[in-house]
């Protein structure tokens, strides 16, 4: 604890492991809205944030649960869901007139093909202008769910393991082998909003 004048207590959000203030300052100095992408185990959240002295303001937001309302039957925490969430956010942002942004990955490590960069790719495909490097974004096969399809086909021989792994897909009426077509169908639906 703070016992004398030499000890400096870090900001509360830094102590809690929520904010990297050096990175945040760099993003705010750009003067552009921030594309904030966050992933949990079962959901993906994307927001377009603008700075305000009283606190950041959310300009546009998209949640992977919105995809379910649009007819998405896959898992809301996987890579195709992250891509579609970014696409939905980008479409809403372009409609609102916010076509330029900068990616705010927060405390997430920049790993090639991560869900945060799938959100970025979705926003780019919707027509937003966000500075990025192409090598960090996952392949198209992973963004549309072909890797899930390939895994389902390899697991098809063991019926019990297949049913256990893909029980929610089957419960919702979607064969995991049909996921790429389902993602493309939903992509067209979002682009035509």
Swiss-Prot record:
Database matches in Gene3D superfamilies: 3.30.420.100
CDD domains recorded: Ribosomal_L18_L5e
Cleaved signal peptide residues: none
Transmembrane regions: none
Superkingdom of origin: Archaea
Pfam families in alphabetical order: Ribosomal_L5e (PF17144)
GO BP term, pick one: ribosomal large subunit assembly
GO cellular component: cytosolic large ribosomal subunit
Listed GO MF terms: 5S rRNA binding; structural constituent of ribosome
Keyword Transport: no
Keywords, alphabetical: Ribonucleoprotein, Ribosomal protein, RNA-binding, rRNA-binding
InterPro entries tied to this protein: Rbsml_uL18_euk (IPR005485)
Quaternary structure and interacting proteins, as annotated: Part of the 50S ribosomal subunit. Contacts the 5S and 23S rRNAs.
Protein family according to the UniProt entry: Belongs to the universal ribosomal protein uL18 family.
Task performed by this protein: This is one of the proteins that bind and probably mediate the attachment of the 5S RNA into the large ribosomal subunit, where it forms part of the central protuberance.
Protein name: Large ribosomal subunit protein uL18
Source organism of this protein record: Methanococcus maripaludis (strain C7 / ATCC BAA-1331)
